[in-house]
């Protein structure tokens, strides 16, 4: 449904996105994670037609949204956007949520019903006449989410939706994201500084580094089989050892400074690799009691 093909974006001669490519299917939750300044917010703004790419293409349902002006307006109406710092008007909650509906020419009677329904979805039923600017940060973010969802978008874009929120508000927003996707089938693309939030919520994760996706995969793939040393370090793997692939009794092993570690991954002999070792992958036993088992790695140690 959403295709990113070599998307580039520069500001004042500095390239922020240097060829971002990915495919997001209808009904998926796609998380964009990456270091600060990696271009996560820029990418979402390009998808939402708030900025224009320097190069490459963004296609939604096969339409290049930045090349086809006639289609861009129609496509934009298919999308809702929630920003990191939600902007609310100095009026009631109901008036804030109704803005997009009025732009679309919806009749007042229908607007009232849709606003009430949207507030119920985000857990703010009865808030219609509250002044929006008197709400807490978490409540404001839920109002922003209701405002985005009241237009019934096919695609929901969320830029750091839980940044600076307290843990209770974070949990409520995360529950809403899952429920909206599950119940309405909405395609959701969100950026986050919290990589574990991506792990909890997303079907696919894109790790944005150095202007490109260094890896796109399921949470399990990204966190247990990182595509590079850089990705491994970013997702929190600290024990990374360099080695060279060697043949070992008909199987593959990695020679890491004299210690051979067997691997199930299909590797090519003499290939230089990096081993990512997690504490949960290790078992410690006293040296005198250590036993060897076929296919298991046993490392020598002292009492």
Which sequence ranges carry the predicted segments?
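Conserved ABC ATPase signature
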Residues: 131-135, 139
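Conserved ABC ATPase "signature" region
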Residues: 102, 109-127, 178
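Glycine/charge-rich catalytic "coupling/switch" loops of P-loop NTPases
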Residues: 258-303
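Catalytic Walker B motif of ABC-type/P-loop ATPase nucleotide-binding domains
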Residues: 156-159
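Conserved catalytic motifs of ABC-family nucleotide-binding domains
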Residues: 152
């Amino acid at each position: 449904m959403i295709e990113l093909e070599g998307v580039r974006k520069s500001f004042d001669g500095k390239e922020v996105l240097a060829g971002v490519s990915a495919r997001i299917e209808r009904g998926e939750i796609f998380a964009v994670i990456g270091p600060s300044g990696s271009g996560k917010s820029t990418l979402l703004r390009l998808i939402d037609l708030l900025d224009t790419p320097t190069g490459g293409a963004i296609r939604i349902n096969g339409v290049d949204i930045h090349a086809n002006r006639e289609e861009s307006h129609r496509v934009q109406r298919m999308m809702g956007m929630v920003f990191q710092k939600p902007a609310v008007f100095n009026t009631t909650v109901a008036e804030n949520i109704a803005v997009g509906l009025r732009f679309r020419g919806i009749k007042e009677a229908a607007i009232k019903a849709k606003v009430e329904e949207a507030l119920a979805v985000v857990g703010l039923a009865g808030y219609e006449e509250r002044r929006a600017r008197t709400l807490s940060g978490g409540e404001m973010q839920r109002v922003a989410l209701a405002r985005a969802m009241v237009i019934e978008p096919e695609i929901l874009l969320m830029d750091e939706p839980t940044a600076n929120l307290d843990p209770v508000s974070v949990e409520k927003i995360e529950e809403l994201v899952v429920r909206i996707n599950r119940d309405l089938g909405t395609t959701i693309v969100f950026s986050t500084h919290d990589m574990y939030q991506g792990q909890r919520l997303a079907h696919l994760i894109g790790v944005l580094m150095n202007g490109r996706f260094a890896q796109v995969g399921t949470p399990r793939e990204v966190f247990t089989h990182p595509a590079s040393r850089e990705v491994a370090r970013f997702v929190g793997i600290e024990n990374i050892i360099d080695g060279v692939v060697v043949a070992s009794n008909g199987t593959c092993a990695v020679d890491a400074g004299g210690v051979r570690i067997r691997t199930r991954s299909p590797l090519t002999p003499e290939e230089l690799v990096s081993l990512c070792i997690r504490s949960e992958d290790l078992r410690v036993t006293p040296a005198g009691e250590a036993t060897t088992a076929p296919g298991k790695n046993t490392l020598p140690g002292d009492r």
